[in-house]
């Protein structure tokens, strides 16, 4: 799987004509979100809702809300970014990359390492709190923030969140009976689809790396590598406090280390239209995403 990403990354940097049609990439992302959400719901149906699930949700939400404050402080100290741009970037690093999460889940499964199925719900819960804390940081700096219905619509009804949570609920309601009916769809093709999707993400990340020159400083590049490490450490601390299994701890670390490039950019376009989106996307998709997939 990771080699598929590396292939796409190399092809993009080498300026190969290799490409994946946008419609195909969209379909693969929809499939992966549905499959991982459904399987997580089935796991919860067999496990039941208990204190561990609620504690994991609370820990994930706390991480998502607090990590932007650390990211904001590091960005202001190590880069020349304005408070507005630093807060926008910080929101990306408090939220999560669902693709990184799906990849980590697949890697654990391939190695026979079990993890808590409800971590899918934790992932969905960690999308929005970072946006709220980033907007608070901007408001504190005196800049204008748009907190209107359109913003909350972007935060709460983002397509990836709706599909992930919806599939999770379907899996939780139907349980093993539902899995028996569609296992040929959500289980067997998963690894192959993920490989093709990671190939496309490698192509996208390569384009981000090519465009990084002139957009971000050396300090920002260092931040893009250091911040996920600090996030992973924070995620491990929360996992140990909660008492997650080794697989669950690895997923919590993955969530805390990743950076959003889907849900948060859409919200930032509404809430902080003056912020420079190329900085956030170059860091999250061009630096942190390939670092997490190849090294992390």
Where are the regions a protein language model picked out?
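Alpha-helical transmembrane segments of multi-pass small-molecule/ion transporters
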Residues: 1-10, 22, 49-206, 213-217, ...
